[in-house]
């Protein structure tokens, strides 16, 4: 019997398993590897961390998110050193928004948390930023906060690999299968996988992302939200021209009728050997999946054509004259969380469910990749302290 089992081998689950395996020699981390080949033929679960680039930054309008990010980023060097796997790339990052004295604007709140936490940044008008970085254009009359230091992006695939490797080095058993059933009817929790295995654990952490509610059967207020991302392939010459590109988050002042805003990553080489600029945003009109099968169907598809067109338009507006080899759309899912009144909570859920020997850690709210180590640590600590 395991003392701890973590269900979900993603960013939060792998981080939690790394911490739990420091405290116990009876830990299992259960979750499938990334599907190979064409996603359209895959019948199992998916993970939005199957990617090469996620923005990492400390500046955030929420002090909680800023703290989780700051604490996670502080652990990146140790995780890279212990695993021998690099995943953190310092490119700097910008956030663009309204120039206003309103203390509750996104940028003003982000600037306050940066000052509280000692985050290094420079502040520009959009016109002044364009003079320094002429490749990138935002709307007139906006403010740009340019975070330096550790800001940039992480490779989420590599971060998961690093966390899993360290957990395994510390004695955790890695079970590369999908948990299909969680049975709490006994002195321990019984887990059954698609590979036919049955495992028992005293305490279980479910970190299954968008599938968490479907797997546990608990009503947790999780809202799996489909997103479309765009991958713009560029050649070596264009990548060289944009080699100083920071990550970009621009929501205030975009004024696009279809999407709320846009985030853009710098050129990154992907496993197919090509270099892409990845971007995403938030479509206003969303059809939410109501079941695990609908969620799987979304991942197997090609996303929203409306969202893809809007994203490509914004990319070419931010980087005028961008030369692309191809532009393709892919699917992603963000797991948000609402309270009993349907109001967006904006932070992850880390809480026990049922009889108390099962916990969940879910709802990354589209911002958890960079902060996943700290979120996983907090979940592991709470599970460890459960009695």
PLM feature spans:
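N-terminal Rossmann-like FAD-binding beta1-loop-alpha1 element of flavoenzymes
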Residues: 2-29
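Active-site substrate-recognition segment that forms the wall
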Residues: 18-23, 84-90, 198, 203, ...
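Glycine-rich FAD pyrophosphate-binding loop
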Residues: 22-48
């Amino acid at each position: 019997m395991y003392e701890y089992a973590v269900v979900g081998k993603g960013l939060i689950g792998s981080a939690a398993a790394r911490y739990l395996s420091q405290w116990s020699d009876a830990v299992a981390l259960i979750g499938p590897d990334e599907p190979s080949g064409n996603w359209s033929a895959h019948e199992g679960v998916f993970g939005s961390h199957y990617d090469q680039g996620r923005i990492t930054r400390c500046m955030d309008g929420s002090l909680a998110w800023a703290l989780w990010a700051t604490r996670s980023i502080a652990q990146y060097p140790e995780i890279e050193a212990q695993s021998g796997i690099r995943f953190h790339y310092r490119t700097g990052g910008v956030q663009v928004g309204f120039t206003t004295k309103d203390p509750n604007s996104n940028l003003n709140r982000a600037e306050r948390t940066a000052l509280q936490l000692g985050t290094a940044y420079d502040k520009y008008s959009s016109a002044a930023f364009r003079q320094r970085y002429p490749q990138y254009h935002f709307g007139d009359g906006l403010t740009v906060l340019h975070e330096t230091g550790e800001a940039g992006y992480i490779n989420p695939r590599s971060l998961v690999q690093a966390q899993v490797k360290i957990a395994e080095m510390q004695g955790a058993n890695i079970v590369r299968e999908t948990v299909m059933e969680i049975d709490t009817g006994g002195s321990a929790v019984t887990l059954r996988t698609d590979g036919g295995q049955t495992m028992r654990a005293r305490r279980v952490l479910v970190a299954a992302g968008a599938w968490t509610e479907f797997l546990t059967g608990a009503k947790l207020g999780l809202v799996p939200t489909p997103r479309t991302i765009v991958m713009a392939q560029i050649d070596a010459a264009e990548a060289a021209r944009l080699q100083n590109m920071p990550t970009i988050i621009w929501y205030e002042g975009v004024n696009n009728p279809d999407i709320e805003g846009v985030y853009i990553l710098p050129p990154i080489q992907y496993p197919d050997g090509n270099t892409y600029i990845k971007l995403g945003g938030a479509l206003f009109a969303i059809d939410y999946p109501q079941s695990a099968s609908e969620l799987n169907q979304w991942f197997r598809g090609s996303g929203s054509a409306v969202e893809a067109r809007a994203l490509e338009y914004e990319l070419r507006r931010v980087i005028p004259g961008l030369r692309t080899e191809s532009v393709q759309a892919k699917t992603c899912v963000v797991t948000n969380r609402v309270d009993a009144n349907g109001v967006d909570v904006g932070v992850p859920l880390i809480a026990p469910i049922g009889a108390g020997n099962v916990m969940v850690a879910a709802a990354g709210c589209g911002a958890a990749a960079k902060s996943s180590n700290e979120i996983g640590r907090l979940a592991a600590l709470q599970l460890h302290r459960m009695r």
